[in-house]
Amino acid sequence: MIPARRRAAIAICSGIAVAAAAGAARAQSVEQFYKGRQVTMVVGAAPGGINDITARFVARHLGAYIPGHPTIVVQNQPGAGGIAAANRLYNVFERDGSVIAKLERAVPMLAIQGDPNVSFDPRRLTWLGSLSSYAKDAYLMLVMAANPIKSADELRQPGKSITLGGDNAASSNLIFATIAKDVLGLNINVVRGYAGAAPMFLAMQRGELDGQIIGYSSVRTGQRDLWSHHAFRPLLQFGRATRLADFPDIPTGHELTKDPTASALLDFAELQFLISLPFAAPPGIPADRAQALQTAFMAMCADPAVLDDAEKLGIEMSPIDGETILGSIARAAATPHAVIVRYNALAGPQRD
C-alpha cells in the first residue's frame, strides 16, 4: 500500500502535470493545432440533399483559409430532422475546434419553440456563419407546369385545390403547407410521410401529388434538368419580405394576408431563412480557434473561385457572419409567446 504522504505527493504531481498539459495546449498556436489535423464536418442530414451538398462544398474549400490548412472530412449523422446532430455538437463532441457542423436552418428555432427533443442552447454555439441569408432565394410553392391551377388566388375559389407533399411533422415544407392552408386560407390538402424532396418530385411526375414547397436554390440544384425545361410552376414564395426578382409575378405569403396576427406568425416562421445554410462549432472552444474559423469562413465566402464553384452547384451565396446569426436568434427569442404557441400548434405533433 502506498503511504498517505506519498499518495498526496503523487496527486500533487499529477495535478501539476495536467495543468502543465493544459497550459501547453493553450500556448499552442492556431496554426500548430490545425497543421496536419483532420477536422470533422458533421451533417445532420442524409447524403444527396442541399445540406449534404453545401457541407461537402465547404469541406472542399474551408481548410485553405484556416491556419495550418487542415483536411476536412464530412460525416453524415441524420436523425430527428437535424436535432440529433445539433445535440451531439453541443453535448458530446470535443470543444477544441476539431469538429464543425452544417446544421439544418430550422434547428436553432426549435430550441426557441421549446421542442422537447432539443438539448442545446443556440445562443451558446460557436457560429461560423451562413452561406446564405436568402437574399437571392425563395421558398417556393411549386406545382407541375401542366397543373390547371395557375395562381395562388385560384386556391381561394370553391372547388379548386391542390395536394402538397411533406415529410415529417416539423419539417419546413409541411409547416409552410399548413400555414398556407390554415393561416392564408388556401384550399390545400397535405400528405405527409415522404422521405425528402426527391420522392415528392417523383410523386408529382406520377400525378400522386400536385406539388410541394421547396427552396428555389434546392430545386435548381436537385432538379436541374426539369427546372431548365420549365417543368414546374411557382404559385407562392415564402422566406421573403418582397418578391424575388426572378419571380416578379409570384406573390409572397405576406401579400395574401392583412391580419397582423397572421403576419407576426409568418415573420417568426420565416426567420429561419435568414440563416439558411448555417455552420457552427461547439460552445467553449478556445477563442483564438473560434476567431480563426469564423474569419476563415467569411474569407472563403469572398473568394471569387469559391463563388464560381458555388454557382456551378446552384448554391445561393449571400453570406452572413456568426454575429448576424446570433442577432437573428435573439430576434426570434423576442417573439411574443402567443405567436410561438400558435406556430407550435400549426407545426403539429413532434417528429416520429
What residue spans do the PLM features occupy?
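Conserved hydrophobic/amphipathic secondary-structure segments
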Residues: 28-276, 343, 347-351
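Bacterial N-terminal signal peptides
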Residues: 11-20
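A short beta-strand structural signal in non-transmembrane regions
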Residues: 276-282
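N-terminal export leaders
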Residues: 5-10
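Structural beta->alpha junctions
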Residues: 47, 282-286
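An extracytoplasmic/periplasmic, membrane-proximal ligand-sensing/linker region
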Residues: 35-39, 229-230, 256-258, 264, ...
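Sec/Tat signal peptide C-region and signal peptidase I cleavage site
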Residues: 21-27
